[in-house]
Amino acid sequence: MDNQEVSMDVETPIAKTNDDRSLPFSIFKKANNPVTLKFENLVYTVKLKDSQGCFGKNDKTEERTILKGLTGIVKPGEILAMLGPSGSGKTSLLTALGGRVGEGKGKLTGNISYNNKPLSKAVKRTTGFVTQDDALYPNLTVTETLVFTALLRLPNSFKKQEKIKQAKAVMTELGLDRCKDTIIGGPFLRGVSGGERKRVSIGQEILINPSLLFLDEPTSGLDSTTAQRIVSILWELARGGRTVVTTIHQPSSRLFYMFDKLLLLSEGNPVYFGLGSNAMDYFASVGYSPLVERINPSDFLLDIANGVGSDESQRPEAMKAALVAFYKTNLLDSVINEVKGQDDLCNKPRESSRVATNTYGDWPTTWWQQFCVLLKRGLKQRRHDSFSGMKVAQIFIVSFLCGLLWWQTKISRLQDQIGLLFFISSFWAFFPLFQQIFTFPQERAMLQKERSSGMYRLSPYFLSRVVGDLPMELILPTCFLVITYWMAGLNHNLANFFVTLLVLLVHVLVSGGLGLALGALVMDQKSATTLGSVIMLTFLLAGGYYVQHVPVFISWIKYVSIGYYTYKLLILGQYTANELYPCGDNGKLRCHVGDFEGIKHIGFNSGLVSALALTAMLVVYRVIAYIALTRIGKTKSG
């Protein structure tokens, strides 16, 4: 799929609007609002904890400086490539320049300006940021991915059909037409190739015709031909008056000379900033030349940044210190003068731009539009997972097995009946818990990416996710109960069946809410699974079936247990306290259900309290999940 040439000249005609602003959209047209990016004396420090001992005692906090006084400028039409060994601070600098340093992640000092102004929400929403790991939904096709992004990111000055046409135009110009109906795919799901995935990620960002474009190692893991195509796209975008900043790991010679400016980093220190074509001459002037004439410049520069030179007698640390000193002596003053001397009077927004910053307001689209698009996207993404054959088979097998094991159980076998009720509450405690506990950890990267770009509010995302999961949460337990209830011969009164069904559905929603809350709080699948298992098992043990006489000092657990309230309501939905059942050795006696040993301690009072408790849990768990999600995508600026 990745062998087609990238089309550079295809334009998709789009109907003109009433104000005669046509949209023959091309991703390579001039940027609407050129931006000059400056950064001065950037220092970024983080605190790292060093735990000692088996239980992490004697924690020592170490402050590490990631970026050490970086200064530079990138003008419209230029590509700045940041080169350096792993751990040199490239991604940290890119994240800082893109305004995506998360709160609590570290301390950033210095000054970053965009046309001599600090980063605003409006500028941030017209800035593209492509992460190294392509955060894409695996079950969506290429077309669906770009169309949904267009519907969310383009402002309401575009009509819906215009947004769709713009998405398709981007797809055409990036050479993605041949795979437009192919799903993105993932680790265990075959989809588009690596190069096509990267172009889709770039396409998502250039839909808004950004003036600033940040990319984190866009050629990582790609073959040389595909990498050439990606950088060619960046080169064309820059020639349209955009400011492009990218980290690069080890580019080929062809790619190296396509970058206008180069920033070489060594352990967070700048050792070169200037024209990429002048880098080799500069290092030769300070006494560092390659041993062979024909060498990939990036290979030589990475050796330099690692402290590996032609002089084997010079230790790496001494060489790195010398390079930093040479930079401060020979280059720093000229870089500072360039930053100070640049004015941005020419960088005024075009009044005719429909993607100008003032068209966005606080958000590009309304709350309701965001909710509808996110709901539709979520349903399409999960259309194969929600009712997968494995899940449906699991539910039907368990329901029929329960129906057979408890086949037409009469009230004379009261112990068996309440055992079935407890099993129902137990099974439908764990099933929705583990369905929902992975929700937010799996979508963290996507949520981080989209929230950081100001694509939508958190509330429509959260509600669309909750509403979108309702079909799976409600239909499967309904099917389960319809089969099990009547096969097991529980109370044949239709009203009792619907009460039992209502209790079960609320129970499922509460258990699912607990899963959402744990996943959002922990944001780690393994840890959340372990924690969820412990909590739910505790709830079930305190539910009143296994242990009927709980010690006073620990009896409070049942009042926070989902299982306790559900089990009680299921019993209330089947029996009354004065209902009679056969008892005694030969079953000739008649006893009240309320006096049965397995039910007596549960009681038939406080049914309303139990219902209100479950309702409160249903709300509280989701509120906790929402609050926990507010930290995702939250940055220090913008």
Curated annotation (Swiss-Prot):
Glycans are attached at N111, N139. Residues 369-575 form the ABC transmembrane type-2 domain. SUPFAM superfamilies: P-loop containing nucleoside triphosphate hydrolases. Disruption phenotype: Pollen grains of the double mutant abcg9 abcg31 shrivel up and collapse upon exposure to dry air, and exhibit an immature coat containing reduced levels of steryl glycosides, thus leading to a low viability. Defective in sterol (e.g. 24-methylene cholesterol) composition. Vascular patterning defects in cotyledons and the floral stem, with a stronger phenotype in plant missing also ABCG11 and ABCG14. The chain crosses the membrane at residues 387-407, 418-438, 470-490, 497-517, 534-554, 608-628. It is a multi-pass membrane protein. GO terms for biological process: cotyledon vascular tissue pattern formation; glycoside transport; pollen wall assembly; stem vascular tissue pattern formation. One of its GO terms (cellular component) is pollen coat. InterPro entries: AAA+_ATPase, ABC2_TM, ABC_transporter-like_ATP-bd, ABC_transporter-like_CS, ABCG_dom, ABCG_transporters, P-loop_NTPase. Coiled coil: none annotated. PROSITE patterns: ABC_TRANSPORTER_1, ABC_TRANSPORTER_2. It is found in: Cell membrane. Keywords: ATP-binding, Cell membrane, Glycoprotein, Membrane, Nucleotide-binding, Transmembrane, Transmembrane helix, Transport. Residues 37-292 form the ABC transporter domain. Belongs to the ABC transporter superfamily. ABCG family. Eye pigment precursor importer (TC 3.A.1.204) subfamily. Homodimer. Forms heterodimers with ABCG11. This is ABC transporter G family member 9.
